[in-house]
């Protein structure tokens, strides 16, 4: 194997970002950073699945409007979500006449979309690529755990799937933030079977990717102004810190988790914090990106994490394999 880390010779630059979040996310600590929030997570639709499609569609339209661009100016859209056969992304793209690639790495899908888009631009095949993902608490609960109508009690280690959509436009033309490099993750399985404890399942995958990234680049964790994992939650973040110490790469105080950032754990009763494909996407396309633009952060490593289970695998007693991909963003001086 050559290397898990790709340095882009012709890097993609972020042209614009957009984020729309649900009512619970709006009440969280970073609620003011989102472009738009909704008061009703059904968005007036007949099902939560349709609501997620509506939210994803609205986010892409808002993104194009912010960038003052038309669909015809976009060469490709790389999108994903958590629903069966990524119907959320597929149905969203019915509204756009844009070439489309649907991807899936569970809650690490946002990083995968950026890696795919950046690679197309680096190779000269595309000029502008949209990368987007969505997730919805109620549709995810129905698919992976229990329908809300059952009223099941949530476990202490459970996390709250983020209702949101995040999207950005990658451009070959120089901008303020570039995608410098990316580390592709491997599938890691530590034998966790509890679908209500995904932080424990995903932390080893985040560890493996971070260690590979630091070894491939020769960097230390403090090289970055901040490192953000996607949705390990409070318990998963503690496990990651412990594992990274064992590997000889202790994480600095500047490390944080998007799932911890997006909610007030105690006040909002969200268990260990946020999760979901849109957790890292919505936090990056609002809070993190704005801090990069204003110069508070110049070098950021984003490491979205994904639990690769399905409703069938859980019922069959399978363990939960996980993956994490890392993307390095640099503020252009």
Language model features with spans:
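Conserved beta-ketoacyl condensing-enzyme motif
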Residues: 14, 49-105, 223-238
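Short, well-ordered amphipathic alpha-helical segments that serve as non-catalytic structural scaffolds
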Residues: 52-68, 116, 201-216, 283-288
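Short beta-strand segments
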Residues: 79-80, 129-135, 300-305
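Active-site-adjacent elements of ketosynthase-type condensing enzymes
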Residues: 81-97, 137-150, 236-237, 283, ...
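Short glycine/threonine-rich loop-to-helix capping motif typified by GTGT followed
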Residues: 90-93, 232-247, 312-319
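A short, structured active-site edge motif that brings together acidic residues
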Residues: 101-108, 256-259
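Active-site-proximal alpha-helical scaffold in enzymes
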Residues: 104-131, 170, 275-296
């Amino acid at each position: 194997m050559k290397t898990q880390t790709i340095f882009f010779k012709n890097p993609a630059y972020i042209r614009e970002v957009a984020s729309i979040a649900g009512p619970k996310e709006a009440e969280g600590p970073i609620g003011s950073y989102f472009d738009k929030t909704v008061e009703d997570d059904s968005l007036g639709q007949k099902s939560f699945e349709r609501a997620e499609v509506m939210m994803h569609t609205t986010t892409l339209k808002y993104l194009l409007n912010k960038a003052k661009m038309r669909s015809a100016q976009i060469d490709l859209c790389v999108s994903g979500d958590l629903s069966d056969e990524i119907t959320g992304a597929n149905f969203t793209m019915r509204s756009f006449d844009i070439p489309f690639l649907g991807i899936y790495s569970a809650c690490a899908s946002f990083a995968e979309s950026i890696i795919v888009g950046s690679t197309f631009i680096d190779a000269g095949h595309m000029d502008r690529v949209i990368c987007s993902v969505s997730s919805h608490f109620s549709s995810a609960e129905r698919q992976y755990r229990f329908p809300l109508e059952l009223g099941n009690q949530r476990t202490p280690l459970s996390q709250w799937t983020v209702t949101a959509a995040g999207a950005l436009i990658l451009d070959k033309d120089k901008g303020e933030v570039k995608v410098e490099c990316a580390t592709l993750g491997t599938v890691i399985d530590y034998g966790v079977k509890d679908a209500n404890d995904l932080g424990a399942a995903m932390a080893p995958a985040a560890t493996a990717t971070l260690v590979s990234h630091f070894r491939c680049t020769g960097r230390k964790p403090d090289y970055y102004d901040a490192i953000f994992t996607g949705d390990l939650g409070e318990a998963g973040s503690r496990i990651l810190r412990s594992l990274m110490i064992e590997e000889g790469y202790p994480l600095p105080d500047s490390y944080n988790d998007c799932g911890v950032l997006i909610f007030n754990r105690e006040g909002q009763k969200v268990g260990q914090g946020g999760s979901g494909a849109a957790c890292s996407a919505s936090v990056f396309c609002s809070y993190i990106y704005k801090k990069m633009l204003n110069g508070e952060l110049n070098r950021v490593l984003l490491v979205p994490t994904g639990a690769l289970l399905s409703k069938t695998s859980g019922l069959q007693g399978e363990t939960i394999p996980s993956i994490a991909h890392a993307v390095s963003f640099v503020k252009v001086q």
